[in-house]
Amino acid sequence: MVLAAAARETSRIRLTSTVTVLSSADPVRVFEDFATLDLLSGGRAELTAGRGAYLESFPLFGVDLDRYDEYFEDRLDLLLHVAEHEVVDWQGTTRAPLSGAGV
């Protein structure tokens, strides 16, 4: 919401978050949010994805710390796949599969 407000009030600055923690976020929703912001801002949105360093909060999101690396790699793979395809067929290990999903 803050980035959308910045997009409305400015015309040249790049719009990005410090980091979007994919291990505890849904990559499809992250893509949709940033794609919408990019459209509304005339192509000024930039996404920075990361693993997250504050591990104590991960169990609150149902992330098993023993699978920490797997969560990030699996969700980054999905984020990149969604960015390249309008219709998504995908099956990973940390999220429900997608079949013919329009994004």
Language model: regions and residue ranges:
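Structural preference for beta-strand elements that scaffold enzyme active sites
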Residues: 12-19, 44-48
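Internal, glycine-rich beta/alpha segment that forms the wall or movable "lid"
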Residues: 23-103
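Short active-site-proximal "capping" loops at secondary-structure junctions
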Residues: 1, 21-22
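N-terminal beta1-alpha1-beta2 module of alpha/beta enzyme domains
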Residues: 1-14
